[in-house]
Regions:
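Non-catalytic surface loops within mature trypsin-like serine protease
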Residues: 12, 86-88, 162-166
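A general secondary-structure boundary signal
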Residues: 4-13, 94, 139, 159-161
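A general structural signal for short secondary-structure junctions and capping/turn motifs
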Residues: 42-47, 71-76, 128-131, 148-152
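Catalytic core of Fe(II)/2-oxoglutarate
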Residues: 109-181
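Extracellular structured ligand-interaction cores
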Residues: 5, 77-83, 90, 145, ...
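Catalytic core of non-heme Fe(II) oxygenases with the double-stranded beta-helix
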Residues: 59-137
């Protein structure tokens, strides 16, 4: 069974406010002021919330035309994000496996922790080709090693990091129960 990617049709609209600077790889997203109360209440009713949100921008002919292989956080697990991706061309997302002894801690431009490893230490385990990702909403396993291949056009992804009421990350199996629509 795939525990890495699932397209969802969220029952409420998401108010997309695109960053003014499309050439920064990662910027904070003000979800508190840009999400409807209906959207936030849906999470609250299920004892989950958005821990933080950011926007990732990658584009051709720039320093950032792909997303390097990494795992979000301090360890490998199955925590999820909700992503909304906008891109005029198909996007390829890959997930990878590696022996944990090769993992190295690093940080994103927003100072969030992540794990990386040398490229020759990875084994590709799953690929998802988003053929028409313009506004596609999906659950995304961010706790496993993943990366995006080079893109042909500007690609903007809104990432919502989902947490349980106790502050822990929402894990894939529980997300499948909550987002079964």
């Amino acid at each position: 069974m795939n525990n890495l990617y699932k397209e969802i049709n969220f029952p409420f609209p998401f108010n997309f406010v695109f960053p003014k600077d499309k050439f920064k790889i990662q910027v904070r997203y003000d979800f508190e002021n840009n999400l409807s109360d209906e959207y936030k209440n849906w999470f609250f009713e299920r004892d989950i919330y958005i821990g933080h949100a950011h926007v990732v921008n990658i584009g051709p002919n720039s320093k950032y035309d792909y997303v390097p292989i990494h795992g979000d956080g301090d360890w490998i697990d199955n925590h999820v994000k909700i992503n909304y991706t906008f891109c005029k061309h198909p996007v390829t997302i890959n997930w990878y496996d590696t022996d944990e002894k090769y993992l190295k801690k690093s940080y994103t431009p927003l100072n969030h922790s992540m794990l990386t490893a040398d490229e020759d230490k990875y084994t590709k385990m799953y690929t998802k080709n988003q053929l028409n990702p313009n506004g596609q909403c999906y659950l995304f396993n961010a706790g496993q090693l993943h990366g995006l291949e080079k893109v042909e056009s500007l690609c903007t992804t809104f990432c919502l990091v989902i947490k349980n009421k106790d502050g822990s990350h929402l894990q894939w199996d529980k997300a499948m129960e909550l987002f079964d629509f």
